[in-house]
Amino acid sequence: MAKPIVFSGVQPSGELTIGNYLGALRNWVKMQEDYECIFCVVDLHAITVRQDPVALRKATLDVLALYLACGIDPNKSTIFVQSHVPEHTQLSWVLNCYTYFGEMSRMTQFKDKSARYAENINVGLFDYPVLMAADILLYQAKSVPVGDDQKQHLEITRDIANRFNALYGNIFTIPEIFIGKAGARIMSLQDPEKKMSKSDDNRNNVVTLLEDPKSVAKKIKRAVTDSDEPPVVRYDVQNKAGVSNLLDILSAVTDKPIADLEKEFEGKMYGHLKTAVADEVSTLLASLQERFHQYRNDETLLDNILRQGAEKARAKAQETLAKVYEAVGFVAAK
């Protein structure tokens, strides 16, 4: 029996954080056993914000090496760079013609990024969700692991697919949201009301996967908690967001249930919790970074993985695109 297909990707912009690892990459590794996984480095999405070309090339290979270091296996999963598979943009154009301007205007991420990058509000940024829809629908993905901030984009993907299918038959698989439970929402260290983001301008809010241990410890020990006297290490997202975030991180890294951690730190100071989090995160990252450098220093290996991944991805993508082209009435190339 064929495994259900999963598609997901990461932009090569900004450094990946422990939030990316605990909320996404670690779950992807586990999914390889039960799903046919297709993992992409989405460089076309990255250029909706201005990128330095040299930095973009480096970051693309960095993301690939991090995929491998985290445990994504090219023998089990298809791994490729988005721009290496032209069918993504070809399908995106067709889907544009079945997507309404009003739908795109309601996308909250476009509004947020437009405010942040007011000097470069480009059409690509506006059209980002349609390219994301093409990424997913091209591979007939059944499940898409996304964070809460991407739910709206997946919902519009489903709308576009249903609209197209209603006109032309069952061309596309309708994707479902897959949200991992453990570590799905790792929050900012200084502002635990918002999600940790690799694009955060305040670097004290994030711990990156390639950060040195001293910096990791420094940031975590400065993390926001609260002013309760005496301090109480208790999981309460509404009233103790900072403490809850540290417990989430520690639970995700150690696989210990939150309830067990609450008992472990009963009667202890917040400093004890922060030290434990810093130690566990540093140990995790030291091992991951060692594997990262082994892969990153072998660009021949990385190039081969990307070439083979693109070949596998294109074979599947071309099947879907051929069905779409036939459905809308394009003359097939001979």
Curated annotation (Swiss-Prot):
UniProt KW keywords: Aminoacyl-tRNA synthetase, ATP-binding, Cytoplasm, Ligase, Nucleotide-binding, Protein biosynthesis
Motif ('KMSKS' region): 195-199
Binding site for ATP: 11-13, 19-20, 147-149, 186, 195-199
The reaction(s) this protein catalyses: tRNA(Trp) + L-tryptophan + ATP = L-tryptophyl-tRNA(Trp) + AMP + diphosphate + H(+)
Heme in keyword set: no
Motif ('HIGH' region): 12-20
A GO molecular-function annotation: ATP binding
Entry EC number(s): 6.1.1.2
InterPro entries reported in the protein's UniProt record: aa-tRNA-synth_I_CS (IPR001412), aa-tRNA-synth_Ic (IPR002305), Rossmann-like_a/b/a_fold (IPR014729), Trp-tRNA-ligase (IPR002306), Trp-tRNA-ligase_bac-type (IPR024109), Trp-tRNA_synthetase (IPR050203)
Subcellular location: Cytoplasm
GO cellular component, one term: cytosol
Gene Ontology biological process: tryptophanyl-tRNA aminoacylation
Binding site for L-tryptophan: 135
Any Pfam family: tRNA-synt_1b
PANTHER family: TRYPTOPHAN--TRNA LIGASE, MITOCHONDRIAL (PTHR43766:SF1)
Family indicated by similarity: Belongs to the class-I aminoacyl-tRNA synthetase family.
Quaternary state and interactors: Homodimer.
Its job: Catalyzes the attachment of tryptophan to tRNA(Trp).
Protein name listed in UniProt: Tryptophan--tRNA ligase
Source organism of the structure: Haemophilus influenzae (strain ATCC 51907 / DSM 11121 / KW20 / Rd)
